[in-house]
A protein has these predicted regions:
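Short hydrophobic membrane-inserting alpha-helices and related fusion/pore-forming segments
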Residues: 26-37, 76-91, 139-156
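Membrane-interface extramembranous regions at the lipid-water interface
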Residues: 1-25, 38-78, 93-139, 159-179
Length: 179
């Protein structure tokens, strides 16, 4: 049975990056600290995907899409109005594609190592992330209707928290299976 040490190490970095992102969000009120932690998390994601890409092309695709999303995010930061909304939706879709490649590639590698349970968890994580993306896009498009947008924002928050926790659990378990 083949092991995937680069994927395991890369996924560990992705897990750490997600923890750093949580800390960055909590410390976002401290402008410099939050921004630095956000950048550290972003670098860890890119390094993790690049490292994992040595074991499977799915991670390489996720890496490339992450770079494209970074560019879209920078451009989006300098635009507003309709263009900003469109770029925001594009970024949501690109994030979803990255999660798709990370989760499905990892699930497939886990199955190849005989861990069908982790593979099934990956499918569940992916479906929740897809639901989050759909709700997020709909909320973005309906942002001009405040009451509806507020309801969707609450639903989105609940689903995102569940999806994020399951994603973290998935990222934490995957390196043990793939190593």
């Amino acid at each position: 049975m083949r092991s995937y040490p680069n994927a395991a190490q890369g996924l560990k970095l992705l897990f750490i990056a997600e923890i750093v992102a949580i800390v960055a969000a909590v410390l976002s009120l401290v402008p410099v600290v939050g921004a630095i932690l956000y950048i550290v998390g972003l670098v860890l994601v890119l390094v993790g995907l690049h490292k994992a890409g040595a074991d499977d092309a799915g991670y390489k695709t996720a890496f490339t899409i992450s770079i494209v999303n970074l560019v879209v995010g920078v451009i989006s930061g300098f635009t507003g109005g309709v263009i900003g909304t469109i770029l925001s939706i594009v970024s949501i879709i690109l994030d979803l594609i990255v999660v798709y490649y990370v989760v499905n590639t990892t699930a497939n590698l886990a199955r190849s190592r005989g861990d069908s349970e982790l593979g099934a968890k990956g499918e569940k994580v992916w479906k929740l992330y897809l639901a989050c993306a759909v709700i997020n896009v709909v909320a973005s498009l309906l942002s001009f209707i405040p009451v509806l947008a507020a309801v969707l924002a609450i639903v989105l928050l609940v689903v995102q928290i569940i999806a994020y926790i399951l994603y973290l659990i998935f990222l934490n378990k995957a390196p043990k299976t793939l190593a």
